[in-house]
Amino acid sequence: MELYLDTANVAEVERLARIYPLAGVTTNPSIIAAGKVPVWDVLPRLQKAVGPEGTLFAQTMSRDAQGMVEEAKRLSNAVPGIVVKIPVTAEGLAAIKLLKKEGIPTLGTAVYSASQGLLAALAGAKYVAPYVNRVDAQGGDGIRMVQELQSLLEMHAPESKVLAASFKTPRQALDCLLAGCEAITLPLDVAQQMLGTPAVESAIEKFEQDWNNAFGALNL
């Protein structure tokens, strides 16, 4: 199972990489734009933050296949090993096929249906990213869509992985993992909610109080 952070905040990646078993970091144009640091400056810093074993994801901006391929090559040259995110449109599918031949790994992004995700995988995408909460927000069932996509990939494109994205709660992420997803990417707030249960602190404080009352110290 691969756990990613969905952010371009270098300081937060450095902080959480010490704590979480991270596989890397995913970004998108909106995330990069929010940080107001040019993509060619922030990507090397993020790569350093996740370490040599971490994987970095960044997205193209062109709308046509040839432009996507050219941008993907620039990204791959700037950050060796990067996985290039390609929106799963008609032109995006064409770009994924071309990049597969070039040996540049891709992630099919902006996936709102299982059929769309399957096409990306069949075209050669290494990862497929269904948007769980965004599907829910449109009146759909994001978890069910992920379940269907996971089953389809297992049957027809086992070399591709579902990398589920767009979460508002830890429960959504856990449901995707229970559906068999091999990878998820979490925004910072959801990642921290996974450890931020008030009951945990209450339990620790009770342990400390009992220990201190018995031994007059808070160490072994």
From Swiss-Prot:
Catalytic residues identified in the record: K85
Keyword Disulfide bond part of the UniProt annotation: no
Principal place of residence: cytoplasm
Transmembrane among keywords: no
EC primary class: lyase
UniProtKB keywords: Carbohydrate metabolism, Cytoplasm, Lyase, Schiff base
UniProt GO BP: fructose metabolic process
Position of the signal peptide: none
Gene Ontology terms for molecular function: fructose 6-phosphate aldolase activity
Highest taxon listed in the record's lineage: Bacteria
GO CC, alphabetical: cytoplasm
PANTHER family listed in its UniProt record: FRUCTOSE-6-PHOSPHATE ALDOLASE 1-RELATED, TRANSALDOLASE
Quaternary structure and interacting proteins, as annotated: Homodecamer.
Function according to Swiss-Prot or TrEMBL: Catalyzes the reversible formation of fructose 6-phosphate from dihydroxyacetone and D-glyceraldehyde 3-phosphate via an aldolization reaction.
Entry's family note: Belongs to the transaldolase family. Type 3A subfamily.
Protein name: Fructose-6-phosphate aldolase
Organism: Klebsiella pneumoniae subsp. pneumoniae (strain ATCC 700721 / MGH 78578)
Gene transcribed to yield this protein: fsa
